[in-house]
Regions:
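Extended charged low-complexity segments that act as oligomerization/scaffolding linkers
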Residues: 15, 22-107, 284, 288, ...
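Non-catalytic, alpha-helical, charged scaffold/linker segments
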Residues: 65-195
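Long, positively charged, glycine-interspersed low-complexity recognition regions
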Residues: 53, 219-299
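Long, positively charged binding patches that form subdomain-scale interaction surfaces
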Residues: 165-245
Length: 299
């Protein structure tokens, strides 16, 4: 859908659907007026890195123009903060105040690891400005760099393909597979849970995984992650290399954003795995549908 937005700016003839073109124009106008936030994330950096030449330049320019400095925090950082909140409550340990906004203008918000600030004799105000300029210049450079970067194929997806094919797993009930999906999600992030516990001074016990599993409903992003895994496993979906990026970033966005636009496949499994929550699933597959939802929220 970013390509639709980009084409609506740089080559309108490539947007064949009139409704898509109109929706793109409305969304861009709202974003530039500050009425809606359309953030950039590190997933966009990964996706644009596979492109090159004019196509990449146009797409990157569109992302930078519409996002206006807004970023979605790294899903890894979001779920670590969710786990900190749970552990702080369970062990009655006060957590240090932290910036919790998932969508932020803070320098380096979309990074998984905090940038190491170089030693400087600059006054605090100027040092802060320098840090912000460096952070946003980095986003610009990464997105606009015309060099094509080959995608790295991780083995994460094959683990779940193997689980789906396992006869013992296939014999389990749908309910048990959903439970297993959440358990696998907690297992995936357990090292992050350990880091969260250590940062709070909480003893790392064998029951850490059980504590996180029992409280998964109170962790929006991790809950979506677990429920999507369970849904796809019980439906024997084929796992592709890019699924990890989609589930991490779209799942995190779905947990916190008002409206999320995704490709049809991701929209389908996010909607079907949503289950009973306080609000309906915000994920849609078509840009006009997203604009319709936003229009209702803005009225």
């Amino acid at each position: 859908h970013w390509s639709t937005l980009s084409n609506s700016i740089f080559d309108r003839t490539r947007v064949r659907d009139k409704e898509d073109l109109e929706a793109a124009g409305r969304l861009i106008a709202w974003a530039e007026a500050g009425r809606v936030i359309v953030p950039v994330s590190s997933a966009h950096a990964l996706e644009t890195s596979a492109l090159y030449n004019e196509r990449r330049q146009n797409l990157a320019a569109t992302i930078l123009r519409i996002s206006r400095g807004w970023q979605m925090r790294s899903p890894v950082m979001v779920r670590m903060r969710e786990m900190k909140g749970v552990l702080s409550d369970v062990y009655s340990v006060p957590a240090a105040p932290d910036e919790l906004d998932v969508f932020s203008l803070a320098a380096g918000a979309m990074d998984t690891k905090r940038r190491v600030a170089s030693a400087s004799d600059l006054p605090p105000g100027l040092a802060k400005l320098t840090n912000r300029l460096t952070a946003f210049s980095t986003i610009y450079d990464v997105l606009m760099n015309p060099e094509r970067v080959p995608s790295v194929v991780a083995g994460w997806h094959e683990h779940f393909n193997n689980v789906s094919r396992d006869p013992e797993f296939r014999a389990r009930s749908s309910k048990q597979k959903s439970i297993d999906g959440r358990a696998m999600a907690v297992s995936d992030v357990l090292q992050e849970g350990v880091a969260a516990a250590l940062s709070l001074g909480v003893p790392v016990e064998e029951r850490l995984a059980s504590v996180l599993y029992a409280r998964i409903d109170s962790m929006p992003s991790l809950r979506v992650y677990g429920d999507v895994i369970g849904h796809r496993l019980k439906n024997r979906a084929k796992w592709e290399p890019n699924d990890l990026i989609d589930i991490l970033f779209l799942g995190c966005a779905a947990a916190y954003a008002d409206v999320v636009v995704a490709e049809r496949t991701a929209t389908d499994y996010l909607q079907r795995s949503w289950g009973s929550r306080d609000r309906s699933c915000p994920v849609v597959a078509k840009l006009p549908e997203a604009v319709g939802k936003l229009s209702h929220l803005l009225d």
